[in-house]
C-alpha cells in the first residue's frame, strides 16, 4: 500500500471539508460565473481556481459585488508549488494548516515558528497546551479567531533563526487522544531536536501532566527519509496530516518514506492555480 493511501487527502483542489467535490464553488458563485466556467479553456484555464483568479473574472466579480477571495480561502486548498519542487513558504504551510483545522474540528493549527522562539515573539512559545485542550486558547479558523477544545496540536518550525531566510522545516505534533498522550518532534532529515525544542517539549509535558496521568515526549528522528534539498516542507505537513488521520508515529520509525511520495503529496496539498 502506498503511504498516501493511509491518509484521507486527495488531489482534488477543493477544500477537504466540502462533501460535494463536483465543484469547489458555492452554488451562488457557480450561477454567477456560469458563462466563464463553461468557456474556461478560452481563458487559458483548466481549473475553477484558475477561472476565479483570472483578471477578467476578478473584474467582473468586483462589478457584481462577488467575494471571490472568500471562496478561495474557504472552499479551495491553499496556493502553493503543486506541480514543481519549489520550496514551501510559511504562508503555504500556515494556510494549509488553517484549512485542515476546518476539516478536523479538534485540531489546533499553530502558526509557523523560527527556532529562536524562546526570545522572539511567536505564538508557538506562548501556547498553553492545557488551554488548547480545554478550548481556552485562541486559534484562527475559517477567517475568524475562535476558541474550541482541541485534542491535537500541530506546528511547523524552521531550524533557522528569525534573522535568516530559512533552512529546514520540521514538525511538532501533540496528541491528546487516547490513554497515553504524546508530544512529538519529526525531522525528515533524521536529526535530533535542538535545545529549544527539547525545552519546549518538556515544558508542555509538565503542563499536560497536571490534567492527564501519562504524557511522553518522542523524537521521531531515527530514519533519514529525505534525500532531496526541497521536500522538508511537504514531509513536515505530511507527518501532521498522517497523525491527524491516526497513522501511528511508529510508521515513521519503521520504514522510509520517499521523496517521490512527497512529490505526489504536493498535489494533495495545493490547489491548481
UniProtKB/Swiss-Prot annotation:
The UniProt record gives the binding positions of substrate as 226
- GO CC annotation, single: host cell cytoplasm
Subcellular localization: Host cytoplasm; Virion
What keywords would UniProt list here? Host cytoplasm, Host-virus interaction, Hydrolase, Inhibition of host innate immune response by virus, Late protein, Protease, Thiol protease, Viral immunoevasion, Virion
Q: What is its main location?
A: host cell
Function according to Swiss-Prot or TrEMBL: Cysteine protease that plays several role during infection including processing of the structural polyprotein or inhibition of the host immune response. Catalyzes the maturation of the pp220 and pp62 polyprotein precursors into core-shell proteins. Plays a role in the disruption of host pyroptosis via specific cleavage of gasdermin D/GSDMD. In addition, strongly decreases the host cGAS-STING signaling by targeting IKBKE via its enzymatic activity. Also impairs host FOXJ1-mediated antiviral effect via degradation of FOXJ1.
What's the protein name? SUMO-1 cysteine protease S273R
Q: Source species, please?
A: African swine fever virus (isolate Tick/South Africa/Pretoriuskop Pr4/1996)
